[in-house]
């Protein structure tokens, strides 16, 4: 991975707009969430570098959807693809809120549908609930 995709350490004078936005976004989180979102953003930055894109400026919804497709082509399950996009979508959302980009390219990006297996959901029926109360 080249230095263009490095998110940390914090060196504002030598960081790109995308790196500063990533550090700003990640500063909101701690622990496992910070670690997970850092990983997700490193993956996004690496994909952008391989694709010749800036990871923040000039990104369009089509780029985000191509990335989503590439995650599926790597063999990730639909639920994992959706999970991998949490950090990336948050990154764009906060970059837009902070005025770094004029629009959020990920807001309308189509994610895979994830079906919950209702048969595995445990719950009480009406009579069990009445007895419980």
Model-inferred region functions:
Residues 1-2, 127:
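Charged/polar interaction segments and conserved charged motifs
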Residues 2-7, 47-51:
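Boundary/linker elements of alpha-helical solenoid repeat scaffolds
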Residues 5-22:
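Short alpha-helical hairpin
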Residues 12-16, 58, 123:
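Short helix-capping and inter-helix turn/linker motifs at the boundaries of alpha-helical repeat units
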Residues 18, 40, 125-128:
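Alpha-helical structural motif
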Residues 19-35, 42-120:
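N-terminal core-binding DNA-recognition domain of tyrosine recombinases/integrases
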Residues 115-133:
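Long, amphipathic, Lys/Arg-enriched alpha-helical "connector/arm" segment
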């Amino acid at each position: 991975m080249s230095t263009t995709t490095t998110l940390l350490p914090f060196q504002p004078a030598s960081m790109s707009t995308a790196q500063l936005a990533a550090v700003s976004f990640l500063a909101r989180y701690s622990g496992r969430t910070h670690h997970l979102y850092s990983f997700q953003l490193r993956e996004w930055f690496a994909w952008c570098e391989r694709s010749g894109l800036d990871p923040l400026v000039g990104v369009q919804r089509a780029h985000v959807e191509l990335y989503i497709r590439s995650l599926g082509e790597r063999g990730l399950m639909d639920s994992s693809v959706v999970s991998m996009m949490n950090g990336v979508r948050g990154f764009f959302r906060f970059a837009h809120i902070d005025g770094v980009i004029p629009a959020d390219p990920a807001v309308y990006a189509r994610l895979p549908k994830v079906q919950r297996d209702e048969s595995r959901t445990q719950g009480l029926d009406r009579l069990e609930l009445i007895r419980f109360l």
